[in-house]
Amino acid sequence: MTTRAQAPVGVFDSGLGGLSVLRAIRAELPAESLLYLADSRHAPYGEKPPEFIAGRTLRVCEWLVGQGCKALVIACNTATAQAVHLLREQLAVPVIGVEPGLKPAVATSRSRVVGVLATESTLRSDKFARLLGNVSGDCRVLCQPGYGLVPLIERGDTHSPAVLELLRAYLLPMLEAGADTLVLGCTHYPFLQDAIREIAGDRLTLIDTGHAVARHLGRTLAAAHLQATGAAASPRFLSTADVLPLQAMVAALLGEAPMAQRIDIGDTAVPPLASHQ
């Protein structure tokens, strides 16, 4: 096994939502070391111009490659939609993106009405338009931007009256239109599953693509002979903003109490990250 295979996989999101993907990767690929980076200083990406999203995503991913990551998982639907092709052109490591799980939703739906809850940027992207055209078939697809949800989740708020009020506004019209399946089209939204269940009960089957992304990563690493062996180190957690929300979310989601590190990734070259003790 090469030293390169023992290098970490970088997992990147605009904020904390990608922790749902990191959890799935740890379950599927326990030997892989993971470096999680939350660009929380600039979250949420979903309300920013496409040019900013693409440029910022490339800058952060260049930095992760500079830290020695052997592969990257873009655990952010918005960043994937706006930048994944650019990343694959510019970076010399495998890049795995995420996209709304519309294909499994269409296969699952019995009513042939599917809801998609995602950021406005994802829903407006050419990548999503192509996905919709390719897989929707005879399904009616109801697309709803999740305005206001990501900032609440970034603060650790996943079940407050404010969250429930927004979710009711977004989900009740889908239910009234006959939707029986809901695509969680942002990696933040799996944290809302309990709140969604409170509103919809068992009327909606929820589609979360975290484990599909993890399996795709595993296949990609195997094809490139980059699979790690042995016991992985604990994940490292980095943020471009206050680390306390990241630490709190990791504790709640993974049952761990990590010491996250704050970093600065500007528009110009930055020094390498200090070695982790």
UniProtKB/Swiss-Prot annotation:
It is an enzyme of class 5 (isomerase). Keywords: Cell shape, Cell wall biogenesis/degradation, Isomerase, Peptidoglycan synthesis. Signal peptide: none annotated. Coiled coil: none annotated. The active site is at C76 (proton donor/acceptor), C186 (proton donor/acceptor). GO terms for molecular function: glutamate racemase activity. Its EC number is 5.1.1.3. Pathway: Cell wall biogenesis; peptidoglycan biosynthesis. Substrate binds at D13, S14, Y45, G46, N77, T78, T187, H188. It catalyses: L-glutamate = D-glutamate. GO terms for biological process: cell wall organization; peptidoglycan biosynthetic process; regulation of cell shape. Provides the (R)-glutamate required for cell wall biosynthesis. Belongs to the aspartate/glutamate racemases family. This is Glutamate racemase. The lineage of its organism: Bacteria, Pseudomonadati, Pseudomonadota, Betaproteobacteria, Burkholderiales.
